[in-house]
From Swiss-Prot:
Homotetramer. It comes from Salmonella gallinarum (strain 287/91 / NCTC 13346). This is NAD-dependent malic enzyme. Pfam families: malic, Malic_M. It is an enzyme of class 1 (oxidoreductase).
């Protein structure tokens, strides 16, 4: 039976002439038809030939290949995004594996560092502390009324690069690009926001080109009052928004999430998204080895909000697999710069306190050190899994990895710190130090490793496997909150799509070319769980799937019809 493709309805717009060509969400460039050129006063403003979007994308791809550095490629792609968003997303989807590291990690890190230098055109909303009493007016200036997803940062902890001030805006822009490219959320529904509360980066304060508020960061009550004013303004403007907190400093990330997750539909991708993709990866890796995650001993290097968030989700998963909470917590060991977190360690943050090991249980350990180092922990715990979220390069030393491999034939090693310059160890070294026996997953993209004439593909434990599907699921289901169970359902769905589990070979995570399929599946699982949890209206499975399909935007041009303002 012949399949009939339903043509998208015409779009009625009031803009014409040069104004239309300057509107990135509506501009088609050389793809405006002859009729549209007449109707919208575009005759003579474009070359004669009417092109298809694929012809435009092919030209853009050829131009892209002419740039030699990743930052120049990033600037070029951002220019297309600010000129013709539909073409931008068609190009990115056509070359996702090539371009994802350019529009997001690791290249976005350099773009944030050089934000004021490479700035060309405004995108998103910049809310500075001196303008804190004008937030309602600022948000009213946003031309898109139907915003459904906001990614917001204050620029204080950008990847592993620290305080980038207003340059942190590169992260929400890049993140929302992936919401669209991977999760099918229309760019018309997205809004990047930076809260400009100053910067403590002296290099930026001394930079004559720096475009942010030249002031040390506000803190404490002033800071939290400012963020609260922003949250209330967002709720007033877009009551049903999905708000993602991104790259806030450790001291603020967890308090903000705790404070607002039950007030507005929100989540923190650094804490919850990273945890969800990591747990999904570990579930898949454990199943591929014929075991369960609850049978593994896990050591973390890095006990910040991200590391502790991952640990808590691992504990929740192993409880689902049958462990008691106490037994689940005894399997997880957190190491930070002061050593293993124990019940005798002072000045722990509240989210760290639940993840300590009891010193009474460590009496038999083979060590004479008062401060238990990562090597001490690996030697005594004999872990199956080693996870790095320290933001410091080179801390997974050869001695540590070889010690781990001595007791674990197939170690799982996950140096997750971003960007690549901050990774705890390179996949090449880990593969060599374990004689080719380690399963490696990284936070940033790495090329396959060749060791002793064998090719080892390296899985990227990328949050983009998770957050676009969560966003799509929330929008499609109308969920009012994001619960822990919704995040767990995303992890489980990701694990079910593992080629290593399903085929007995290949990567532990799906290929990036399949990420839209994965995002759709996660959206359904998240939406279904939202209904079960009572944070979304219950519908049939068919209705939920239809809502996902209806909300899945594709980078295709629609016919335009003229209307009055």
């Amino acid at each position: 039976m012949e399949t009939i493709t339903k043509k998208a309805r015409s779009l009625y717009i009031p803009y014409a002439g040069p104004v239309l060509l300057e509107f990135p969400l509506l501009n088609k460039g050389s793809a405006f038809s002859a009729e549209e050129r007449r109707n919208f006063n575009l005759s003579g403003l474009l070359p004669e030939v009417v092109e298809s979007i694929e012809e435009q994308a092919e030209r853009a791809w050829l131009q892209y290949q002419g740039f030699k550095t990743e930052i120049d490629k990033h600037i070029y792609l951002r220019n297309i995004q600010d000129t013709n968003e539909t073409l931008f997303y068609r190009l990115v989807q056509n070359h996702l594996e090539e371009m994802m590291p350019v529009i997001y990690t690791p290249t976005v890190g350099a773009a944030c560092e050089r934000f004021s230098e490479i700035y060309r055109r405004a995108r998103g909303v910049f809310i500075s502390y001196p303008n804190r009493h004008n937030m309602d007016d600022i948000l009213q200036n946003v031309p898109n009324h139907n915003i459904k997803v906001i990614v917001v940062t204050d620029g204080e902890r950008i990847l592993g690069l620290g305080d980038q001030g207003i340059g942190g805006m590169g992260i929400p822009i890049g993140k929302l690009s992936l919401y669209t490219a991977c999760g099918g959320i229309s760019p018309a529904y997205t809004l990047p926001v930076v809260l400009d509360v100053g910067t403590n980066n002296q290099q930026l304060l001394n930079d004559p080109l720096y475009m942010g508020w030249r002031h040390p960061r506000i803190t404490d009550d002033e800071y939290y009052a400012f963020v609260d004013e922003f949250i209330q303004a967002v709720k007033q403007r877009w009551p049903d928004i999905l708000l993602q907190f991104e790259d806030f400093a450790q001291k603020n990330a967890m308090p903000l999430l705790t404070r607002y997750r039950d007030e507005i539909c929100s989540f923190n991708d650094d804490i919850q998204g990273t945890a969800a993709v990591t747990v999904g990866t570990l579930i898949a890796a454990s199943r591929a080895a014929g075991s369960q995650l609850s049978e593994q001993k896990i050591v973390f290097l890095g006990a910040g909000s991200a590391g502790c968030g991952i640990a808590e989700q691992i504990i929740a998963q192993t409880q689902r697999e049958g462990l008691s909470e106490d037994a689940a917590r005894q399997n997880v060991f957190m190491v930070d710069r002061f050593g293993l977190l124990t019940d005798r360690m002072p000045n722990l943050l509240p989210f760290q306190a639940k993840l300590v090991q009891k010193c009474d249980n460590l009496q038999h350990w083979d060590t004479e050190n008062d401060v238990l180092s990562l090597l001490d922990v690996v030697r005594n715990v004999k872990p199956d899994i080693l996870i790095g979220v320290s933001g410091q390069t080179g801390l997974f030393t050869e001695e540590i990895i070889r010690e781990m491999h001595k007791h674990c034939p197939r170690p799982i090693v996950m140096p997750l710190s971003n960007p690549t310059s901050r990774v705890e160890a390179t996949p090449q070294d880990i593969i060599a130090w374990t004689e080719g026996n380690a399963l490696v997953a990284t936070g940033s993209p790495f090329s396959p490793v060749i060791w002793k004439d064998k090719i080892y593909p390296i899985a990227q434990c990328n949050n983009a496997y998770i957050f676009p599907g969560i966003g799509l699921g929330v929008i499609a289901s109308g969920a009012s909150r994001i619960t822990d169970e919704m995040l767990m359902s995303a992890s489980e769905t990701l694990a079910k799509h593992s080629p290593l589990v399903n085929n007995g070979e290949g990567l532990v995570l799906p290929a990036l070319k399949d990420i839209q399929v994965v995002s759709r599946a996660i959206a359904f699982a998240v939406g279904k769980m939202a209904q079960q949890q009572g944070v979304a209206v219950k519908t049939s499975a068919e209705a939920l799937q239809q809502a996902i399909d209806d909300n899945f935007w594709k980078p295709e041009y629609r016919d335009y019809r003229r209307t009055s303002i």
